[in-house]
Amino acid sequence: EFNTGILKASLAYLPLDVRSPVARMKDILSSVSGNTIVIMGTGVEDPGFGLPQLELVRITDTFDETIEDVQNMSRPSATSLAYVVFTSGSTGKPKGVMIEHRAIVRLVKSDNFPNFPSPARMSHVFNAAFDGASWEMFWMLLNGGTVVCIDYLATLDGKELAAVFAKERVNCAFLAPAMLKLYLTDAREALKNLDFLAVGGEKFDPRDAAEAMTLVRGNIANVYGPTEAGMISTCYTIPKDEAFTNGVQLGRSIYNSGAYVMDPNQQLAGLGVMGEHLFGDGVGRGYTKPELNKNRFIDVTIEGKTVRAYGTGDRMRARVGDGLLEFFGRLDNQFKMRGQRIEAGEVESAMLSHKRVLNAAIVLRGGQEEGEQLEMVGFIVADDDDNTEEEETGNQVEGWQDHFESGMYSDISTAVDQSAIGNDFKGWTSMYDGNDIDKGEMQEWLDDAIHTLHNGQVPHHVLEIGTGSGMILFNLNPGLQSYVGLDPSKSAVEFVNRAIESSPKFAGKAKVHVGMATDVNKLGELHPDLVVFNSVVQYFPTPEYLTEVIDGLIAIPSVKRIFLGDIRSYATNRHFLAARAIHTLGTNNNATKDRVRQKVQELEDREEESLVEPAFFTTLKERRPDVVKHVEVIPKNMKATNELIAYRYTAVVHLRDETDEPVYPTEKDSWIDFEEKQMDKKALLDHLRLSKDAMSVAVSNITYAHTAFERRIVESLDEDSKDDAKDTLGGAAWLSAVRSETESRASLTVPELFEIANEAGFRVEVSAARQWSQNGALDAVFHHFPSSNTDRTLIQFPTDNQLRSSLTLANRPLQKLQRRRAALQVRESLQSLVPTYMVPPNIVVLDTMPLNTNGKIDRKELTRRARTLPKQQTAAPVPDFPISDIEITLCEEATEVFGMKVEISDHFFQLGGHSLLATKLISRIQHRLHVRVTVKDVFDSPVFADLAVIIRQGLAMQNPVAEGQDKQGWSSRVAPRTEVEKM
């Protein structure tokens, strides 16, 4: 009624969405000239625009106003302004489109749509600020129909919507394609009684059209038109026998709406010829800022007459034979999502307005596959927040300390039997599924670590960083004279010290202290000849931290060797992630290339441990030639197959001392490439037997059997990601093909190399120093060099030192955390500047923006990257505010953990969460709510609303309710989960 009253008064209206950011609404109102009245609905708070010539009036106040007769009120004409709608603008500001009365009259002519039902009752589901809402209202009201206004929350609930449709006898509807797709799943009953369904606002999926035709009893029309041409300008009533060639047709222009396809010279294009779609009759007056009209509102000559037209930027053609219009995409960076038109430039400008954003770009992904929604992905280059790096480093170190103290070693005194000390393997779980690693495999792993550490010698004085439960300490040779250990867990330190005191072998020789790796200088004067880090480096926060620790240790005069065991390899990490992805997805058809690619990216984004390449250690000799004599990079010598063997290695740093142990060189041209020569086990053995008199035989690029399959998986993913290739095989068939190809190529394990050497009469040294350049392959030197007093002979293997920047030799988990926070900050900023539908669900922070050969942003490359991103997990629609006491408590504790306000609809990982923060959050929840909840619960239910359900279920199991009263008194403080929450 207000809209029609405004039009009858020869005034114009401007619809606003109360859910839009105040800043955006203020921008819109500021661009409108003249006196403005803003009518507010019941319950809407005063936004405080503070603009001159602006009056705020509550709709309820107008009901009591006494209206005087207005004399000589001018009547509106066909060219009077009817309304102004603001759409996304490429300049970064919304642009207002002025629509005249004639466009409305043109639009609501009933003969535009044949078989129009009578009586007609039309659902009003569109946002009032969307121009589709004007058609819902005026088409019905001006044709004698009824408009049924439906609450926003009801439009999100299929059952509720169907109930409203049935109760109000709705028989006409106008839906955006995305809404229809939702209702085809959740509100099928609502569609069955429709005599007319119009679908428009974005591209109509023909699969949805075909399915809707099986439900809707009346006609279905595909309607099309930009805001500038009065919302709807073409219509295609879909016939029952439609074949959907080239998608759903746009049809023909409606009453008084000229629709033309023009070539670049503004001449009419012939049938079947691509061109730009222009509208003539019925176009709007123009933009509120006249300078924006250029190249959009233009004059064209049609059949000798000058016609004012609007260029849509849509790529079209008129079909040969019947002249029906067909849509083939955009000519610019404008697109539609969920019926809303979006200029990529406006979103990019909004992102660039954030102080940390240096560059920004928007691309689209999805929309091609059945049921797949079109989705925006934002890419930004952000300025590093240097002020937080030192603080984050400290937080990461403290986080691991909390993890060990309150997690892994919290129950060490009772969980580890005295007879198992040194072989307890507490906390050693598989990264594939979280289950304990087989004890036999763990024992083989430990035996190999001790054998490599001893190297045929007896270490006399040992310093260990990260004693843990004492696995290294209690397996050292009897010749040990002194041992000093450091560990961040007080519980573990007390446990090991008690075990030392009760052991005649170690009592009086060993002592463990609470401390971090950087606390060595606090231990007083030390004289270790061997320093041990075993399975510790991954917990260091940054490469710089690791460098600082190593530099401090090599400065101790007595140190001869630094043993760094169980290092997670950065070079082969993608192989490992591929293995985890396939394990998660299964070997059936779920493991398609796209899903594996996305899962790999998801796992990589969640990584919180430090991964280091071998070159990080081999470059120590170049960086400190005065101190470092040699660096070995040694793969695990084990028969078992698990992630500890396949994706970890040992680095042994030998420092210069008075001993004269030689390091044997290898000639660059003497290496035989195992893969290039297509060798196998037999061919290698034969070659060695023929070379039995040689001092050494160097073989490079030996495919590592433990990772060969995963390596080929990654190669296959990379091959396809370089272009737009689609999966030609299902998941199971693809994996089977890769496995067959892997099995057709020869590969070897480290034990097999030792067996071959033994059979051929050689000794062998194996190196993993070139994991990066050789894609995980190994080097081996079979030799007859003179034996020394050690098990291994030092050989100068080739390295990757010259091929890599030092910045790429390790990952930076803290940097990922900072980037996630930067993305979160930009998202929060966007939410205050643009409507929700313009906020990309995925915002990715890049080091640099990729450029094409013209020096412009390479959007094709960004689109390729966007395809690999994991789909964001989101909760079902729930209010942002917590409802129950449990949710309030959860949000409070999460806010403390993250240091920022957390809402119940937030996602743990999208906020930058990882297992350390999960451990901290769980600890706080357990203390506050006295409920058993695990880190796995957080990982399985990362949306806080879903996690609250898990907590509620845990409380219910612990404290069954008797006669409405929880044993812990929680029933008085915890409200039952509401229907809104469940929705």
Swiss-Prot record:
Cofactor note: Binds 6 phosphopantetheines covalently.
Applications (biotechnology): Enniatins have antimicrobial, antiviral and cytotoxic properties. The bioactivity of enniatins can be linked to their inhibition of drug efflux pumps.
EC number assigned by the record: 6.3.2.-, 2.1.1.-
Chain spans, region Adenylation: 5-338
Pathway of action: Antibiotic biosynthesis; enniatin biosynthesis
Sample GO molecular function, one term: methyltransferase activity
Residues annotated as transmembrane: none
Cofactor(s) required for function per UniProt: pantetheine 4'-phosphate
S-adenosyl-L-methionine-dependent N-methyltransferase as annotated region, ranges: 398-554
A GO term from the CC aspect: cytoplasm
Positions bearing O-(pantetheine 4'-phosphoryl)serine: 915
Record carries keyword ATP-binding: no
CDD domains reported for this sequence: AdoMet_MTases (cd02440)
Carrier domain mapped to chain residues: 881-955
Keyword entries, A-Z: Ligase, Methyltransferase, Multifunctional enzyme, Phosphopantetheine, Phosphoprotein, Repeat, Transferase
Pfam families reported in the protein's UniProt record: AMP-binding, Methyltransf_11, PP-binding
Annotated region (Disordered), positions in chain: 961-983
Recorded superkingdom: Eukaryota
Keyword presence, Methyltransferase: yes
Any single GO BP term: secondary metabolite biosynthetic process
Domain comment quoted from the record: NRP synthetases are composed of discrete domains (adenylation (A), thiolation (T) or peptidyl carrier protein (PCP) and condensation (C) domains) which when grouped together are referred to as a single module. Each module is responsible for the recognition (via the A domain) and incorporation of a single amino acid into the growing peptide product. Thus, an NRP synthetase is generally composed of one or more modules and can terminate in a thioesterase domain (TE) that releases the newly synthesized peptide from the enzyme.
Protein family per UniProt: Belongs to the ATP-dependent AMP-binding enzyme family.
The protein's role, per its UniProt record: Nonribosomal peptide synthetase that synthesizes enniatin by coupling three D-hydroxycarboxylic acids and three L-amino acids via amide and ester bonds in an alternating fashion. Whereas ESYN1 can accept different amino acids as precursors (L -valine, L-isoleucine or L-leucine), only one species of D-hydroxycarboxylic acid can be found in natural enniatin isolates (D-hydroxyisovaleric acid, D-Hiv). D-Hiv stems from L-valine deanimation by a valine aminotransferase to 2-keto-isovaleric acid (2-Kiv), which becomes subsequently reduced by a keto-isovaleric acid reductase (KivR) to D-Hiv.
Protein name: Enniatin synthase
